[in-house]
Amino acid sequence: MEHQGWSFEENYSLSTNRRSIRPQDELVELLWRDGQVVLQSQTHREQTQTQKQDHHEEALRSSTFLEDQETVSWIQYPPDEDPFEPDDFSSHFFSTMDPLQRPTSETVKPKSSPEPPQVMVKPKACPDPPPQVMPPPKFRLTNSSSGIRETEMEQYSVTTVGPSHCGSNPSQNDLDVSMSHDRSKNIEEKLNPNASSSSGGSSGCSFGKDIKEMASGRCITTDRKRKRINHTDESVSLSDAIGNKSNQRSGSNRRSRAAEVHNLSERRRRDRINERMKALQELIPHCSKTDKASILDEAIDYLKSLQLQLQVMWMGSGMAAAAASAPMMFPGVQPQQFIRQIQSPVQLPRFPVMDQSAIQNNPGLVCQNPVQNQIISDRFARYIGGFPHMQAATQMQPMEMLRFSSPAGQQSQQPSSVPTKTTDGSRLDH
C-alpha cells in the first residue's frame, strides 16, 4: 500500500528502531522544524531532572556514589519488549520522512549487545554542591596514586551521553561532556601536582622537599630526645659517683684520724714504759742490761735475794738486837729518818716470831752449819756489797747468833743464885 511516498515497510522498520531506542510508556512531543516533523521526548526531561536530584543526593553520600548511580541507570531503562506490539500505532503518522535522509538527531545505533544503552547525566546542569561535599585533598606521598584513581572513578562513574532524540540536545550534551572533562582535569591536577606540565614540575619538587624536611625534622626531634635522655643519665651517674667519692673521702678521713690518735696513745704508752724501766734499772745494783726482758730478769733475782736475806736475818734471835744497835742503811734513806721510825713502835713492821722449840728441833734454820752460811754469803755477796752491816751479820758465827737469840737462853746461862731482899732490908743469896 503506497500513498505519496509512503513506504509501510520502511516506516515499520523506522518505527521499530525508534521503539527499540525509546523505552516503554514514553511521552513524545511532535515539533515542526525546518519542514520536518521532529520527535521530542518529554519523559527524558523528567528523567534528567530526577537524575539531577539523585546526583545531588549522591554527591552528599560519597561512600555509596557508584552503587546508587548504577542502580538508577539500570532502573530507568527496562529491557526492550517484543517489536511486534500491537499497541504502537504512531508509525502510520510519520511516513513523510525519508529513510535515506534522516536527521542526525534520529540516527539509530545498531544493537550490538543485549546490554541496555547508558545515558550520560549532565553534571553541569545540576547545582554546584556545597564546599563541604568534597573534602580538601590531603597532600600525602603514599596517597597520590589513590587520588588519581578516585578522580578516574569519579570521571568514569558518569555514564557516557549519547545523542538524544531531540535535534537541539547534541550540542548541549557535547558542551556538558567537555565541561565535565575539564573539571576532572582540574581536580586531577590539584590531587596530583607531579603529573602537571613542565611549569608545575617545581611544585612537585617542592612537595617532595617538604616531605623530606618533615622526615628530617622528625629524625632531629628523636635525636634530641635521645641526647636529653643520655645527658640526664650521665648527670645522674656523675652525681652518684661524686656522692660515693665524698662518702669514701669522709670514711678515709675518719680512719686516718683514728689511726693518728691510736699512734699518739701508743707513743705515750711506750714513753712511760721506757721511763719506768730506766727507774728500775737504777734501783738494781750492778745492772748493765739494756733490753727490757733482761732488766726484768735482774729485778726478779734481786727481789728474791732480798727476801732470802730478810728470812735469814729474822730467823736468828740476835738479828733484831743487832739491827736495833746497828741499823742497816739502805741507799736513799737518811739515818735520822730511820731512827725516828724505830722509836715509834707503832710504825715498826711486825714479822712472825718463830717458836724456840721449832728452832731447837730444826737447827738448820739457825744456820749453825758454817758451810751453809758460806753458801749463802757467796750467793748474795754481790747484792749485799753495798750493805756492810748486813754482810757482817751474815758472817757471824752461829754461837754468836745464839747468844742474841732469846732472853730464855740468856737466863739459862746466868747463875742460879739470885739475891733476895728480906723484910728487914737484908739481902739473901740462894
From Swiss-Prot:
Residues 42-71, 97-136, 160-183, 223-266, 405-430 are annotated as: Disordered. Residues 244-253, 405-419 have a biased composition (Low complexity). Disruption phenotype: Reduced responses to warm temperature (e.g. 27 degrees Celsius), including thermoresponsive growth-relevant genes expression and hypocotyl growth; this phenotype is stronger in the doule mutant lacking both PIF4 and PTAC12/HMR/PAP5. It is found in: Nucleus. One of its GO terms (biological process) is response to auxin. Changing residue 231 to D: In strain: cv. Bla-6, cv. Et-0, cv. Li-5:3, cv. Mt-0, cv. Pa-2 and cv. Tsu-1. Mainly expressed in leaves, stems and seedlings, and, to a lower extent, in fruits, flowers and roots. One of its GO terms (molecular function) is DNA-binding transcription factor activity. Induction: By UV treatment. Down-regulated by ethylene (ACC) and auxin (IAA), but up-regulated by salt (NaCl), cold and heat. Follows a free-running robust circadian rhythm, with higher levels during the light phase. Rapidly induced by light in etiolated plants. Sixfold induction by both red and far-red light. Accumulates in response to warm temperatures (e.g. 27 degrees Celsius) via PTAC12/HMR/PAP5-mediated stabilization in the light. One of its GO terms (cellular component) is nucleus. Keywords: DNA-binding, Nucleus, Phytochrome signaling pathway, Stress response, Transcription, Transcription regulation. Residues 257-306 form the bHLH domain. Coiled coil: none annotated. Residues 126-136 have a biased composition (Pro residues). Interacts preferentially with the Pfr form of phytochrome B (phyB). Binds DNA as a homodimer, but once bound to DNA, loses its capacity to interact with phyB. Interacts with APRR1/TOC1 and PIF3. Binds to RGL2 and RGA. Forms non-functional heterodimer with HFR1. Interacts with PHYB, CRY1 and CRY2 in the nucleus in response to low blue light (LBL). Interacts with FYPP1 and FYPP3. Associates to PTAC12/HMR/PAP5, which acts as a transcriptional coactivator to trigger the thermoresponsive growth-relevant genes and promote warm-temperature-dependent PIF4 accumulation. Interacts with MED14. Belongs to the bHLH protein family. This is Transcription factor PIF4. The lineage of its organism: Eukaryota, Viridiplantae, Streptophyta, Embryophyta, Tracheophyta.
